[in-house]
Amino acid sequence: IGSFSAASNVTGIITDTVAVSTLLHQHGALSLWDYAAAAPYVPIDMGSSADGNLAYKDAVFISPHKLIGGPGTPGVLVARRELFSNRVPDVPGGGTVRYVSTAEHDYHPEIEHREEAGTPAIIESIRAGLVFQLKEAVGPEVIEARESAFVRAAIARWQQHPHINVLGSHEADRLSIVSFVIRHGDRYLHHNYVVALLNDVFGIQSRGGCSCAGPYGHRLLGIDIERSHEFQRVIN
């Protein structure tokens, strides 16, 4: 199994899903993609395995709450039917059983029923549909082009400032997501202090921290294992 992010939620750097999926399938692996960060900005195409094409995706995971209007929506899994070969649901519960007696039971043959126990998030799912409808109405290509222009302009200015260190490659294709640290003398300003200034003084919404990507943060900041253990001891 190969499971990767379509784009980083830390640096915004985009992965070549076509090349990676092709390589995975050449070696008999499944191609699974996390679109949590990328979904609001880029087209999502599962592709087809017809005519020997190997660039298709076996599954994608999406967090619609990151799209415009998306807070409160459920997560979405889109996967090829052949992956659901287990006749027993991952979480048995209401709606997953088609027939039951005192001696035996049968689970539902339809994947959607078998793998979603209990009452589904009906209103929230309708909302998820609406946010994707909005994205399609604007046009993923339009969004992608406009966001790319924004982030290129920002990086071009920020990378010239001696006290701003934009993390990750400045040349790679990326979403309009940028992580940076601010130097003051021979040290960096605390991230939450920078966030407070951006929000309270300049009205710029931002987030401090490693965004659920601790190991990647170690690499970007050049934190070796010894320094990591020092941080761990202080935190704990």
Question: PLM features: residue spans?
Answer:
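Pyridoxal 5′-phosphate
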Residues: 1-236
